[in-house]
A protein has these predicted regions:
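C-terminal membrane-cytosol helix-exit motif in multi-pass small-molecule transporters
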Residues: 1-20, 41, 204-208
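Extracytoplasmic gate region of multi-pass secondary transporters
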Residues: 32-99, 103, 144, 175-179
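Juxtamembrane helix-start elements in MFS-like secondary transporters
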Residues: 66-75, 102, 121, 125, ...
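MFS transmembrane alpha-helix packing/gate-lining sites
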Residues: 80-85, 135, 167-171
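Paired small-residue
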Residues: 112, 123-132
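Intracellular juxtamembrane helix-capping segments at the cytosolic ends
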Residues: 138-153
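A late C-terminal transmembrane helix in Major Facilitator Superfamily
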Residues: 151-188, 194
Length: 221
């Protein structure tokens, strides 16, 4: 990855630079309830989102679903599902609005997470990985457009996105280690933690959507 990323780093140039230096922090956006709720949902979402990515291989080996050689490819299946989730729902987000897409997909992600411990065969695990990868991929890819929708000043949209992503990164920082500690009590605990975090994220994002545009589902937001 480092090798391939070095190519655009070396050859890309900015077409135009901003006339003024933009701040790294904008306290005014914190007064926006939809933005605050979405950022909180982002925190919970990233807290639980990547737990299966870290532990699905160990789960498969410990439950004799697949050996070490086969279970290695389950992570690949998660990423294969993520490809579909990052592309197709974003197409519909252009028509309906990113917030209208984010909520149902993160909610479905929590449903799949709660079903994790009911997986007992390789076929079931393949289906789990593809669907979870799809729904989680949508959340990861659509967060940026959703934040742009919630920004109250497009000249500071980069600042607002950076602030929200920084807060969301804290959830990613603590989520997987906490799941590892919970794993000492069995697999139900980290799976429940993953699903609960995703549900909290869905509720916060729903709150952001309602605060932004009300309960009218026809509003593009």
């Amino acid at each position: 990855m480092l090798g391939t990323l070095m190519i655009p780093i070396l050859v890309m140039r900015a077409r135009a630079f901003p006339s003024t230096r933009r701040p790294l922090f904008d306290k005014n956006i914190l007064r926006s309830v939809p933005y605050d709720l979405f950022s909180l949902g982002e925190f919970f979402g990233f807290m639980g989102m990547y737990i299966p990515f870290y532990y699905v291989t160990s789960y498969s080996i410990s439950h004799n679903i697949a050996n070490e050689n086969i279970s290695f490819y389950l992570l690949t299946l998660l990423n294969v599902g993520s490809i579909f989730g990052r592309i197709v729902p974003n197409f519909f987000a252009d028509l309906t609005g990113p917030l209208n897409i984010t909520f149902p997909f993160i909610l479905l992600c929590s449903v799949i997470a709660f079903s994790w411990t009911s997986v007992h065969s390789l076929g079931q695990m393949v289906v789990f990985c593809l669907f979870y990868g799809c729904f989680s991929g949508t959340f990861v890819s659509i967060t940026g457009p959703a934040l742009a929708t919630l920004s109250n000043d497009m000249s500071l949209v980069g600042t607002h996105m950076g602030m929200s992503f920084t807060f969301g990164a804290l959830g990613l920082l603590v989520g997987n280690p906490v799941a590892g500690v919970l794993l000492k009590k069995g697999w139900i605990a980290p799976a429940t933690f993953c699903g609960t975090a995703n549900i909290l994220a869905a509720l916060c994002i729903l709150g952001a959507r309602v605060k932004k545009a009300g309960w009218n589902l026809k509003v593009k937001v």
